[in-house]
Structure formats: structure tokens, C-alpha cells
């Protein structure tokens, strides 16, 4: 009976360790996805902030050549 208890505790312990590792990997993956989304948003903001400069440059060229 004692051998069975020890085996059961060992299986439960290893299962908990495995579950903990999986949860940690899942959290890391979610953080990486979140960071990637933030990078995409910041790139979009940088591009959108350039649009007024591009428009004014095109307008000045149109006035100069037009």
C-alpha cells in the first residue's frame, strides 16, 4: 500500500510540474503575441504620422510644377 501511495504522489507531482511548464510556455507565447501586436500598432502610428508630411510634400510639388 505504501508503494502505491508513493507512486501515486510521484505521478501527481510530475503531472503538476508538467502542467506548470505548459502554463508558463502558454503565458510566454501570449506575451510574445501581445508584444507583436504592440509593435504592429506602433508601426502603424508612425506611418500615419507621416501622412501629413507626405501630403504637404505632394501639394508643394503640385504647386511648383503645376
Swiss-Prot record:
Expressed by the skin glands. Residues 25-44 are annotated as: Disordered. Residues 23-46 form a propeptide. The modification Phenylalanine amide is found at residue 65. InterPro entries: Frog_antimicrobial_propeptide, FSAP. It is found in: Secreted; Target cell membrane. The keyword Secreted applies. One of its GO terms (cellular component) is membrane. The keyword ATP-binding does not apply. Residues 30-41 have a biased composition (Acidic residues). One of its GO terms (biological process) is innate immune response. Belongs to the frog skin active peptide (FSAP) family. Phylloseptin subfamily. This is Phylloseptin-S3. It comes from Phyllomedusa sauvagei.
